[in-house]
């Protein structure tokens, strides 16, 4: 299902005691790069590719962020940086993808139970930098992502999606009580993605 909300239904961000979510821009390249490279080992499992390579550069990251910023402005998908309250350190990233995105078109999506993929409007992915896992920033972010889309967005259902290879995040999501609704197998990916509600 494509995104149906109007511009006024896309939040400019969210501020909590622990972090700030705001649309990512190319100007975030350096702090985002620091978070990405600190977390690169587990991001490769989360992404199920070789990204980020050990020789990934700030400039290459800036190019990626320019694309994400364009996609956000065009309302095709929405990417938010997760910053500490002082906005001096990037803590991670959140991605809202429409459930009719190209990556899903070629995937084998298998329901676990009686849910239908087309009843959900967004697939939400997120990661938190490695040094913030021990402070449970990932759990605090997950708690926000369970309620924020229903409260401040006009989404008709959303799923929290992660890679089965990212076992730390899978365990954290399941301990939070979310239920597995779908498995998603993308061609040329070594593992499945798991979609929770």
Feature map (PLM): residue ranges:
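GNAT-family acyltransferases
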Residues: 1-131, 148-197
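Conserved acetyl-CoA pyrophosphate-binding loop and the N-cap/start of the following alpha-helix
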Residues: 132-145
């Amino acid at each position: 299902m494509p995104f149906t909300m109007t511009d006024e239904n896309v939040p400019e961000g969210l501020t909590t005691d622990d972090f700030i979510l705001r649309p990512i821009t190319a100007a975030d390249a350096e702090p985002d790069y620091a978070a990405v490279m600190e977390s690169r080992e587990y991001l490769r499992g989360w992404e199920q590719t070789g990204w980020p390579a050990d020789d990934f550069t700030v400039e290459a990251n800036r190019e990626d962020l320019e694309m994400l910023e364009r996609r956000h402005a065009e309302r095709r998908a929405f990417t938010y940086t997760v910053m500490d309250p002082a906005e001096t350190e990037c803590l991670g990233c959140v991605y809202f993808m429409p459930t009719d995105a190209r990556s899903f078109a070629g995937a084998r999506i298998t329901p676990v139970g009686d849910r239908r993929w087309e009843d959900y409007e967004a697939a939400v992915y997120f990661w938190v930098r490695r040094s913030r896992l021990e402070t449970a920033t990932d759990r605090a972010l997950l708690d926000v992502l369970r309620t924020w889309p229903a409260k401040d967005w006009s989404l008709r259902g959303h799923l929290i999606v992660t890679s089965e290879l990212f076992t730390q995040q899978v365990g954290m999501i399941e301990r939070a009580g979310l239920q597995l609704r779908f498995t998603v197998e993308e061609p040329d990916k070594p593992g499945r993605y798991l979609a929770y509600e």
